[in-house]
């Protein structure tokens, strides 16, 4: 299988430098490998996650540290379009610290939905790197 890469959006480096100061590009990509992973491992969330990806990256509600993987953040945003009012998009984003002259980019690793209860647990038990200010 060839690795297909889709340019998704640009991230705000000022927001995402909470993950690492060493962000080499603002480009965010989604590979077919990640799309297949989301479809296989999170089929109930697949459509919502793909619809909400760009908005979640460009305007996150929270960024939480991924304690297991360096230069990786857990990006969370409330799903406004959901019938369920307590659903949030949860995206794993790997930050690119060496784009090799623009050939590499920040990439979506996975994504799924979490409940408000799960979000509250993450906020209590994990390191919150960023919280969107209420306007």
List the predicted regions and their residue ranges.
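Ribonuclease/tRNase effector modules and their secretory precursors
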Residues: 1-135
């Amino acid at each position: 299988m060839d690795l297909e890469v889709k340019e998704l959006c640009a991230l705000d480096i000022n927001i995402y430098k909470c993950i690492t100061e060493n962000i080499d590009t603002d480009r965010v990509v989604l590979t077919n490998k990640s799309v297949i992973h989301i479809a296989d491992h999170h089929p109930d969330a697949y459509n919502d996650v793909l619809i909400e990806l760009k908005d979640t990256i460009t305007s996150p509600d929270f960024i939480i540290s991924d304690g297991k993987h360096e230069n990786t953040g857990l990006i969370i945003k409330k799903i406004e379009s959901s019938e369920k009012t307590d659903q949030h998009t949860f995206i794993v984003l790997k930050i690119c610290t060496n784009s090799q002259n623009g050939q590499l980019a920040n990439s979506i690793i996975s994504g799924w939905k979490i409940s408000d209860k799960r979000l509250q647990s993450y906020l209590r038990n994990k390191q919150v790197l960023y919280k969107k200010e209420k306007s």
